[in-house]
Design a protein with these regions (language model features):
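A short beta-alpha structural unit
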Residues: 6-12, 39-48
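Condensing-enzyme catalytic core mediating Claisen C-C bond formation in acyl metabolism
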Residues: 1-26, 74-86, 90-92, 119-125, ...
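Conserved beta-strand-centric core segments of catalytic alpha/beta enzyme folds
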Residues: 47-56, 84-145
Length: 145
């Protein structure tokens, strides 16, 4: 198991996902990978709308097509990638300061093959996206050999 890439950023902008876009670009460049190579993702879904907009910001689909990604089932088991198999922050209570660690543990379990009923089959790559207060974003790309 290794961290293959890391992206981060911060902004004072009250709206938008530009920082997530920039952090994802940095992440993919460092990892030498692209969004199409992500098998499982835990992203910061503090609202349903955030999740949809982050599909686009992280490059999982073109801008304006997150709805189609969901309708086609490409964000869940049997699709192109599985997003938030833990249920996401909304189901985990969005615990401040603990949610990033919970995401990391979830993704490592999938890469180790120890996620039980939530297991993403043959997961070898994973992406973590975390947003903090005041527009801070951290992205991490995990992989196993």
């Amino acid at each position: 198991m290794q961290v293959a890439g890391f992206g981060h950023g911060a902004t004072f902008a009250a709206v938008g996902y530009d920082v997530s876009v920039a952090a994802a670009r940095e992440l993919y460049e460092q990892a030498g990978r692209g969004p199409q190579e992500v098998a499982v993702c835990e992203l910061h879904d503090s609202s349903t709308l955030d999740e949809l907009l982050l599909y686009e910001a992280l490059g999982f689909c073109p801008e304006g097509s997150a709805e189609k990604l969901v309708e086609d089932g490409d964000n869940t088991y049997g699709g192109n990638l599985v997003v938030n198999p833990s249920g996401g922050l909304l189901s985990l209570g969005q615990a401040p300061a603990a949610s990033g660690l919970a995401q990391c543990i979830e993704l490592v379990q999938h890469l180790r093959g120890s996620a039980g009923r939530r297991q993403v089959a043959d997961a070898r790559t994973a992406l973590q996206h975390q947003t903090g207060a005041d527009g801070r974003v951290v992205t991490t790309f995990y992989q196993r050999e």
